[in-house]
């Protein structure tokens, strides 16, 4: 079984975020960046499934600047087999991300897509649901465990008041609510990453991408 996992590059959660003086965004220059923690959980889940013999290949995808290759290498050091980067110098909004991921899914043809439930920078929690709708796939959100049983997945979801257990036939899109080995980090740091651009993806899969314009961000306590 082939699994596709997404990984977003975000500001390290332990870094104090500073708003730019003109209010057009937050400072990212010379700021420590890392893989989104929820995406890290998703990669970990995929790796556990591979170790259990249920998964044969893990493909990790990131959309963003060239430096996102570092994020992909982190995921590959954890156990992912291949990395795909769709480069974009601009911030890509959730619906556009979902459309780009749909094109990649149609090309890679995974049996399962695992995504972090949300990114810690914008907390949108939108891409997974949008991707599921665009693909017409069943989905399970806020999951804590996935167990593969033949051609189906037994999923445990965290809900108000307890846990919900579902059985989904593939194909499925799941949102997951660490592992590092030095040898893996060294080996994967030399691995090739397939890089593309939004324009290249759109030339194969015609997409209409919308853009959200940010006017101003205010520091906490300032209105």
Language-model features and meaning:
Residues 1-223:
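N-terminal glycine-rich FAD/FM-binding segment characteristic of electron-transfer flavoproteins
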